[in-house]
């Protein structure tokens, strides 16, 4: 195996194995079924390479019903038998060709090793798309497979019967577009996955599909503006991370007006959860947002002089250890962004303002807020000397009044009634205010660019129905999870509720259509975890907001409040390690530990009302619009300023929008961290399959009557239970299926017959498999006799056919011997 997970990831993956299968390798007589195979995590190769997770083995004769005696067969090269307890054995999908199955849920066994093996076989043969209905799983191949060309778009767009084509992002796009116009209801395609899994690429390909109109008569100006905006959004919202060289650091929801025959008529973009802290600092192997590097490398001499652009290594907000990103040409992308600005119809003055603000944000980082003695404070904030010169340049680039901003960063103003009280900020407070200004200017500039785009692409009368596209991170579980992961995981819990509701609705509809009782369908809701995370009272977010606004609030007090308010729930737990600062949330995907240190600081957008007023009064029209419409109260934080309340309000609006649509799900998965083709790490795959609810989708299908097959497929699969029923031409398929089930003596509560298919509970399907296995096993002696009999008859027939040739050969040999006067007795055998 070419790459490995970290020890922490391997530990997580190992914990996700869950219980083993109900394996039946031995018949009632104590004999092992011939050729019976299992998966196990105790195989020699797994001990040598834990990332492998499972290996395939064949069960040997001599096995009892307790432990299984096995020999590993895949990977090969291990011939020594070893013992496997039943608790470490999983069933194998024998005689199954993964390339003929588009849906994982149709496999006989959907345990974890079977799912991993199924996906691996398809991945290694370049089939990166698979269905786990209602999800489409897309595995990043880290290379161009040539399966997203215009020819492929046309194939999926123009086919009459879409069901005959393999899973693909174009399949999802076509189905969503058909539904949009057939039922006149808005659709949403939700694309999720961890950084580097291919979300951005999948979203781009879906956009290309929608843009590919059958006719060329439509106005392409708006479509071109939407497509051209992608480089700008990526430049301002994407960055190089350890996991991905082009990682989206924000969530994006797009609304598109797509024609019945394709082509994008209008659109709108909503961005949320931009990672503002990246503007200030980056980890050792990471970069800030692409736009900073594009500007510094791509600007000509005149532009550098005009906007005071320095070499990248001279900026304190830029990590000097990582100035380049593999596969990214910053200079070429700078020119692409400039071209995109023109396509978005930005004026020359607006473009100049954008570059000025970007440069000003970087230069503001070079301003050091120093400590001085003043007003009885030993470490009063000050900006003076050379720092003042740099500060004035930065404020000039940001189109802000330098003297007024300097005063707000150093002089503390509070109010007692109508009386103004002036003092000094401490050095650390002044530095925090400066950092908040830099983050806020960048964040609001990003939002302004999106607003400009929307003004040019929105439909004049609003959307009647729309095609939605949500590009969002999946559940994030790191070694150290902070407020960013907390917000991301709240978002995913909301999406998970939507997902479960969809699965339940689809299952219920199938049962109704088939005339089958759905009383067996009982799904588990995540409503409780959402409540303890986001409720107005007695929730984690409520406690965080209260502590942020309370005098003397702290991370420790926030955590203490949570413990007191939520002690009656099982979804919030103190951590075993450092419980004074860590806490656990029982999310849908399992327990996730959060570190509360820094929660309050990150939740406070401490850009004070007085500073926002200065920004709003800027003479530059772009800057003046950045904080337009924000309600302010001097001496206090602006209303709605806390990140948590902004996030929750935005999320609730987003969920209302999505819940009004019919959703489709694409789960993007990264098979390795090396970003190399054909490199497959099972432990990494397992973590993502769990975090993206792929395994849960399969589990949900196991509820109620989890097995459902058309009558003919059912008869073919279980025909040996009763050949007189399955092979009877006088019975229609439904009658034959019922007779076979009666012959099996399967309890009636284990199955129902619908209009076109058989429905079996999971236990019933396993019982039928066992019954058929025992039938075949009991026939084995007879089969052996018949095989020997027919082999003998076949040999005799072949011999009889050859007899004339043998007699003729003998005659020729005898004649040869006589002609040469050779006695037969002198001829020596040749063996």
Curated annotation (Swiss-Prot):
In the record, what lineage is assigned to the organism producing the protein? Eukaryota, Sar, Alveolata, Apicomplexa, Conoidasida
Checking CDD domains in the record gives: MYSc_Myo14
Primary place of residence?
membrane
Location relative to the cell: Cell membrane
Look up and give the organism this protein is from: Toxoplasma gondii
**Keyword ATP-binding assigned:** yes
Record region (Actin-binding): 663-673
Q: What does the entry's domain section say?
A: This protein differs from the typical myosin heavy chain structure in having head and tail domains but no discernible neck domain.
Give the protein name, as stated in the record: Myosin-A
* Entry-linked Pfam families: Myosin_head
Task: Report the InterPro entries cross-referenced here.
Answer: Kinesin_motor_dom_sf (IPR036961), Myosin_head_motor_dom-like (IPR001609), MYSc_Myo14 (IPR036044), P-loop_NTPase (IPR027417)
